[in-house]
Curated annotation (Swiss-Prot):
Protein family membership: Belongs to the ComF/GntX family.
Domain of life: Bacteria
GO biological process assignments: establishment of competence for transformation
Subunit structure: Monomer and dimer in solution. Interacts with ComFA and DprA; ComFA-ComFC form rings about 150 Angstroms in diameter with apparent 6-fold symmetry.
Protein name: Competence protein ComFC
Gene deletion effect: 5-fold decrease in transformation efficiency.
UniProt cross-references to InterPro entries, sorted A to Z: ComF/GntX_DNA_util-trans (IPR051910), Competence_ComF (IPR005222), DZR_2 (IPR044005), PRibTrfase_dom (IPR000836), PRTase-like (IPR029057)
Keyword vocabulary terms for this entry: Competence
UniProt organism field: Bacillus subtilis (strain 168)
Signals that turn on the gene: Part of the comF operon, encoding comFA, comFB and comFC, transcribed in competence media (minimal salts plus glucose) once stationary phase is reached.
Protein's job: Involved in transformation (genetic competence for DNA uptake).
Amino acid sequence: MSNEAGGGIHKLICLLCDSQFSQDVTWRALFLLKPDEKVCYSCRSKLKKITGHICPLCGRPQSVHAVCRDCEVWRTRIRDSLLLRQNRSVYTYNDMMKETLSRFKFRGDAEIINAFKSDFSSTFSKVYPDKHFVLVPIPLSKEREEERGFNQAHLLAECLDRPSHHPLIRLNNEKQSKKKKTERLLSECIFDTKNNSAEGMNIILIDDLYTTGATLHFAARCLLEKGKAASVSSFTLIRS
């Protein structure tokens, strides 16, 4: 089956639901080396990008453009000079993303990263167009990375055409996702770094999920206070 520009139908397998779907292939697309779609229409429609009003600090979707309650809590806990400058994310956290994230992180399906590469890269370029930022993926503990076989933050950082730096050391192996919200907000710092390891750098932390912001805020505090970074912002795949 062809269309006026030439070409035909290309059969593909969805990375999220494993079903077969079709993609129209034109000579123009082939000439421009347009990449294959990775996600079927049904799954793509369930991935909700963040639009509309957000918290200006953490990027949480909400009905008004105002600082959210979690960010107000962080302001009382950490000096403004040691806080994240801002966080921005691509998708909201819904049932579809919950299942996908579980496959990606906890069942070791690293190939799923390719389902998000295009949206992750294009959104990043819009939010952080300045080329002088340095990416710092959030590290896992050695044990966790060996168990999983990869670090999802590293894979996400590799989707972006920017230099990466790895100054952070993970101290605590306990999963932040297993803690209650109040425990995450009040837990001790879980990172360390060498003195002046990020001196003068404008850093963007990369991670998969922003919940309360505990992981990212503690990483920022470490890099600003001990690493002497000039600024720290963050970019995540999902904002819950």
